[in-house]
Amino acid sequence: MCANIPEFDSFYENENINYNLESFAPLNCDVNSPFLPINNNDINVNAYGDENLTYSNFLLSYNDKLATTTAKNNSINNSNSNNNSNNNKNNNNNHNNNNLLGNDISQMAFLLDYPSTLNEPQFAVNCKDIYRKDISTPSSLVSSLPPAKFSLSLSNSPSPPPPSSSSLKHGEAIISNTSESSDIFADPNSFEKDTMPLTQELTLENLNNQLNYPDFTINAIEQDPAPSSFSSSSSSSESTVSSSRKRKPCHDSYTHSSPSSSESKKISDSRLSAEGLAKVLNLESPEEALKRERFILGIFQNELNYPLGYKTWIRDTTKEYRTKLINQLHERVKVKYPEYNQSILETIIRRGTYYMMQSRLRRERRMKLKERKRTT
């Protein structure tokens, strides 16, 4: 096979060398690889007895003929030059660059049979046949390439996984499918049968029909199926209600919420501040709110015998017990504060029990700390 040279920009450090190599007609190898000379009169190509002659072996047989071939390449390059005024300049550049190429054959030999980094099918090409052809035009290069067979289909059936690299034979790159294999270049009618017509409008519905996908259109998603057990009138009314709900914009519950809902959120917080307690009691002064709180907590502790600082309101009591205590507390507090209902009283008790528990725990921690300092 021909040499497969990796493509990277640093391969040719001298742009003149790159220009000289491009002036040769390229083989059926990498477009940036060093090319075979056109004239092969004094070279024994058949010395190796291999129809697929490698480029590295060819260079080894060609090394002793480098001086003669360099002179012939100069004349060929001069004859192929389109601008007659630049013949001498191209001749000098080609002469120097061919010498550089000949001197660097030993350095470039390790790159000649370097495997390709691209996962593409490599075509087996008879280098001697290409060598004998007139390869000065791109059309001869195209004619020298073996035909590649492709089978392309957009059928509904799932396609099997692609073939492994071992199944790729010489000169063929086959894309298997469940449809019958056909050469699209030889028989375009078979290609039109298996594929979607190009004149068909490319819409989401057509694409789903071709690929056997479910309908993901917006109308299909928003449509509510009518239940079979209900009547037509009930189903139509439910559909109108659901559509009106979908059209209703989504609002932020915090920014657009009513004052009562925001206040209820604050009421449920046991760690309510003094300012928050004043808002719950409809008072402007936090000091007055704390004074009324102490009055209510005194009744709750002394008359109802609730252990403040040792039991929390939610964690350490049951719902029935809490309801009983709040009703008893409301009967005693409404004599002085008739505007406070059970909900407001429960907020005061919840806040008071939490802060009384925290203050007791802090006192106990301070006492333990003092005892440790005394013992040490």
UniProtKB/Swiss-Prot annotation:
Chain spans, region Disordered: 73-100, 222-269
GO annotation, cellular component aspect: cytoplasm; nucleus
Compositionally biased tracts (Low complexity): 73-99, 228-243
Domain of life: Eukaryota
Name of this protein: Uncharacterized protein YBL029W
Organism: Saccharomyces cerevisiae (strain ATCC 204508 / S288c) (Baker's yeast)
Lineage: Eukaryota, Fungi, Dikarya, Ascomycota, Saccharomycotina
